Curated annotation (Swiss-Prot):
This is FMN-dependent NADH:quinone oxidoreductase. FMN binds at residues 10, 16-18, 91-94, 135-138. Signal peptide: none annotated. GO terms for molecular function: electron transfer activity; FMN binding; oxidoreductase activity, acting on NAD(P)H as acceptor; oxidoreductase activity, acting on NAD(P)H, quinone or similar compound as acceptor. The lineage of its organism: Bacteria, Pseudomonadati, Pseudomonadota, Gammaproteobacteria, Vibrionales. It comes from Vibrio vulnificus (strain CMCP6).
Amino acid sequence: MSRLLVLKSSILGDYSQSNKLVDEFINHFDHQQLVVRDLAQQPLPVLDFQVATALRAAGELTAEQQAIVTLSDTLIDEIKEADTLVIAAPMYNFTIPTQLKNWIDLIARAGVTFTYTEQGPKGLIEGKKAVIVTTRGGIHKDAASDIITPYLKTVLGFVGITEVEFVYAEALNMGDDFANKGLASASEHLAALTA
């Protein structure tokens, strides 16, 4: 049995292929606890001056700053309580959705999820796995245009999550035959992860 934290970031709601694939995965995954956070339906604040200063503030906080820190703490606690993160990360203009980036900006906190040492940065969230389901209109895996894979590997590794599995559903806008093959390939990969 496992505890899952599911992050959906597609703006397409019920039309989202990444959400459908993630739902398929969690329906077949043996889990005892499930937390689903739809970052498009319940958007998080954008990293701006107010958010950045709140997350770096020392000492007295304003009510607004405290609310931001409390939200960040909640998001981090969700990660700490999970064994596996399942992240739906569709490709929008070669990168992740803004909604997912907002989540990253709130959980990447010096002294909380990572620290700087004499040997360099060290992630403080350990013993977690991540499954990234990424959908794309074209074919980008292993190409220079795939910015998502190295970015998410880097940022998750930076906070200590180094066991990361990517599931690709590609060619979804290249006609029905390509789309069906891309979705079938992703479904097979997800099924293998639940076996």
